[in-house]
Design a protein with these regions (language model features):
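Class I (Rossmann-like) S-adenosyl-L-methionine-dependent methyltransferase catalytic domain
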Residues: 1-135, 175-203
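Local beta-strand N-terminus motif with an aromatic residue
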Residues: 70, 140-141
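Short N-terminal helix/helix-N-cap motif within the alpha/beta-hydrolase-1
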Residues: 84-85, 152-154
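A conserved beta-strand element that flanks and buttresses the S-adenosyl-L-methionine
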Residues: 144
Length: 203
């Protein structure tokens, strides 16, 4: 089982987040509290990440490896480097030569991805962009996401899927994991102001 270097990346994320995290243009809120804390939450065994779906990712890339030994992989949205770590491990285990691009609207997870890529001596392109804006068109064989749809308003999801389709080459695949909450309101899950205030001293 892949062991991510969380003990090293947690203090790095905490340091980077106040410097790199952006403010939402509509609310003025920064995502620094989230990106700065997320690695520590994972160290405590809280939340979900690709580590819980490593077997699924390995099997999915194993199926692709039957017919495709070289591929362009787009990681669409990233809380940290976990998706890159597990997709890279899956590709290596199946002898796939992959080139990676990570897209997110915040520089903190992109910098964490660059940090991990450098540790693993793997080439990585990054793009700081909203996933609802245009993605690099028609250049990728595989698009990967994890727990993304809950962060996208239902009204915006058709546009997101259109961008996914345009980012993929003909016959390209989407490999994704997303939690389903039957019977719950179709809104993003969110923290209440109280725990947020614990993590953000400025509040």
């Amino acid at each position: 089982m892949l062991q991510e270097p969380l003990e090293l990346s947690a203090p790095l994320a905490r340091e980077l987040a106040p410097q790199l995290c952006r403010r939402d243009p509509q609310t003025g809120e920064s995502c620094a509290w989230y990106h700065g804390f997320w690695q520590y939450a994972r160290l405590l065994g809280l939340g979900t990440s690709p580590v819980g779906h490593a077997r699924f990712l390995a099997e999915a890339f194993g199926e692709l490896a039957v017919s495709l030994k070289r591929m362009q992989v787009l990681i669409a949205g990233a809380a940290d480097y976990s998706m890159l770590a597990h997709v890279l491990a899956a590709c290596r285990s199946h002898g796939i030569a992959a080139q990676f691009t990570a897209v997110d609207w915040c520089e903190t997870p992109l910098e964490l991805n660059r940090w991990y890529a450098q540790r693993e001596s793997v080439a990585l392109d990054t793009l700081c962009s909203d996933l609802l804006d245009a993605l690099p068109a028609g250049s990728h064989d595989v698009l990967c996401t994890h727990a993304l749809l809950g962060h996208i308003r239902p009204a915006d999801r058709p546009r997101l899927l259109t961008n996914w389709r345009q980012a993929l080459r003909p016959g390209g695949r989407v490999i994704t994991v997303n939690r389903l909450r039957p019977g719950s309101p179709d809104v993003p899950a969110a923290f209440s102001p109280v725990p947020v205030s614990w993590l953000n001293p400025s509040m």
